[in-house]
Design a protein with these regions (language model features):
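Short coil turns that delineate tetratricopeptide repeat
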Residues: 63, 95-98
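Residue at a conserved register position within TPR or TPR-like alpha-solenoid repeats
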Residues: 41-42, 76-77, 109
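Structural register within alpha-helical repeat arrays
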Residues: 37-38, 72-74, 105
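Structural motif corresponding to the intra-repeat A-B loop/turn of tetratricopeptide repeats
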Residues: 45, 79-80, 112
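TPR-repeat structural position
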Residues: 48, 82-83, 115
Length: 122
């Protein structure tokens, strides 16, 4: 993802809406990718706890959504070094034909030192 998205008007509006909803204790409806963009923003700014809260909010609305589950899987492998948890996230992805599903699965294989398996998989 390009950092430029964080400077877009749409992103700033979505971030503001999300933060206002959290402050007021209300819910907000965004698309899975929009929630994930907000989570990436928080993670980039060193706030992993809030990033994961955003992802949980997304998954409460869209339980099988690719983008939030892929984000959660990446955090599992890159931050927590937990391949099993990452694979659990990937297993919950509803659209097994989404390219991101294939990419995150291969990334997990690579982190798990199964590079040849990842090459065959892709």
């Amino acid at each position: 993802m390009s950092d430029n998205i964080f400077f877009s008007k749409e992103f700033k509006e979505n971030l503001h809406k999300y933060e206002e909803a959290r402050k007021n204790g209300s819910s907000i409806f965004l698309e899975p990718g929009q929630f994930t963009d907000i989570a990436e923003y928080y993670h980039l700014h060193g706030d992993l706890k809030t990033a994961l809260k955003v992802i949980d909010d997304a998954l409460n609305i869209f339980p099988g959504a690719t983008e939030p589950l892929a984000f959660k899987a990446r955090v599992s492998i890159l931050v927590y070094h937990d391949v099993d948890k990452a694979m659990g996230c990937v297993a919950m992805i509803a659209d097994k034909q989404d390219l991101e599903y294939f990419y995150i699965t291969a990334e997990i294989m690579i982190v798990d030192n199964r590079v040849k398996d990842a090459e065959k998989y892709l």
